[in-house]
């Protein structure tokens, strides 16, 4: 469902942000 899509997108976004912070 839509909520699952939101959860997946949020996790992906958090991963992306976390890795860019780690690369700083």
UniProtKB/Swiss-Prot annotation:
Tissue expression remark: Expressed by the skin glands.
Disulfide bond residue pairs: none
Superkingdom assignment: Eukaryota
Main subcellular localisation: secreted
GO biological process assignments: defense response to Gram-negative bacterium
Job description of the protein: Antimicrobial peptide that shows higher potency against Gram-negative bacteria than against Gram-positive bacteria. Has a very week hemolytic activity.
Name under which the protein is recorded: Ascaphin-6
UniProt organism field: Ascaphus truei
